Amino acid sequence: MTAQTSSDVTDQKTDLTRESERDEVLAKATLAKKVAPEIAQLGTGVKNQILLAAAEALLERSAEIIEANSRDIAAGRESGMAESLIDRLALDEGRIEGIAGGLRQVAGLTDPVGEVLQGRVMENGIQMRQVRVPLGVMGMVYEARPNVTVDAFGLALKSGNVALLRGSSTAVHSNTTLVGILQDVLATFDLPRETVQLLPCATRESVQDLITARGLVDVVIPRGGAGLINAVVMGATVPTIETGTGNCHFYIDGDVDVDSAIAMLINGKTRRCSVCNATETALIDSALPDVDKLRVVRALQDAGVTVHGRVAELEAFGATDVVEATENDWDSEYLSFDIAVAVVDGVDAAIEHIEKYSTHHTEAIATNNVFTAQRFADHVDAAAVMINASTAFTDGEQYGMGAEIGISTQKLHARGPMALPELTSTKWILQGTGHTRP
């Protein structure tokens, strides 16, 4: 009989963990599917009461949340997690107040469920109407942002959906505590705790279990970096809504108010450099005077931004301290104080560059020429096109839509900020009086 090695034992433990995770994901998805019809029928008043109660519960139990979060932060630092990621992970009293405020905001939004989108009486007398209905079981796959746990719950509940949440293992203590609090609130309303459930995250394969649970899960929404999103979209058999990465471009035309263009560019790059609507590439028209090209580059550098570009191209008009760009720079969503800068020969060259490297999130132009602006808007393929405005405006709240679950860069079902209406489908209801079709 051959003795087991430590490697054999480790493999067995891994196999058992995988089997346990798979069973847990499918069991929770089955329970979610079972309770979904009940949640779909909740009235607006009840949903709003739950959201407001959840906001209060988060504040009342903030010490519990912060303690759990501190364990995640300690583990993150021990593993060498970057401080920028630690910042995304961290929760304090102020951030918890912001999360609670988000739930209150959702409570104040119009309930999309039951909204009649169109209706008419057919020639044969049948009354027909199209109404909004919940999607059903909504799966979320996301990275180390505990606020997404609560945001997803709030938006799912208000739109009549059940939430299956697969967060990052780096936020497991925070997410477990948050979901426990939300489930406790649901229980006080005699509603199933399975309305929101946290899925296991010990292995990456649990994501695959969720995104292939066709028949149990109605939609999966990935939210995070390009690697996560691509893995979900490419591996899913469940329908997905792609919240894309943001390699956002800002084109400065030759006919432009340079001061205004610089202000918009700096705002888009530095307001919050770690979000998907941050400007990542600046394209400068070759027709812009060299002195103004230099002003653009220096303004970025003065704001603390590292400029990447073709050094010879930028040095030709006096720029210094430029990092030589590689092909990867034009593709990059930096999410940092870095930007790629290139000189292009007019709006058509800018459009061509954007078409090659865009993630179809947000693209912007600064120009005084209405015809150039219209050409840019007509030919750029993106969820949002900004004309003389910062890329930072791609946001559900800025659009007047309220809270959002993400920014969709796909073309089917939803595109742009995904708020409550985008978390619903529609149903056609036809009412006759004994009609039969000849």
From Swiss-Prot:
Primary location recorded for the protein, binned into one broad class: cytoplasm
Question: Which region ranges are annotated with the description Disordered?
Answer: 1-21
Alphabetically ordered keywords of this record: Amino-acid biosynthesis, Cytoplasm, NADP, Oxidoreductase, Proline biosynthesis
Give the record's pathway: Amino-acid biosynthesis; L-proline biosynthesis; L-glutamate 5-semialdehyde from L-glutamate: step 2/2
Spell out the reaction equation it catalyses: L-glutamate 5-semialdehyde + phosphate + NADP(+) = L-glutamyl 5-phosphate + NADPH + H(+)
Q: Where is the composition biased (Basic and acidic residues)?
A: 10-21
List the Gene Ontology MF annotations in alphabetical order: glutamate-5-semialdehyde dehydrogenase activity; NADP binding
Q: What does this protein do?
A: Catalyzes the NADPH-dependent reduction of L-glutamate 5-phosphate into L-glutamate 5-semialdehyde and phosphate. The product spontaneously undergoes cyclization to form 1-pyrroline-5-carboxylate.
Which family, according to UniProt?
Belongs to the gamma-glutamyl phosphate reductase family.
Q: Under what name is this protein listed?
A: Gamma-glutamyl phosphate reductase
Q: Which organism is it from?
A: Corynebacterium efficiens (strain DSM 44549 / YS-314 / AJ 12310 / JCM 11189 / NBRC 100395)
Name of the coding gene: proA
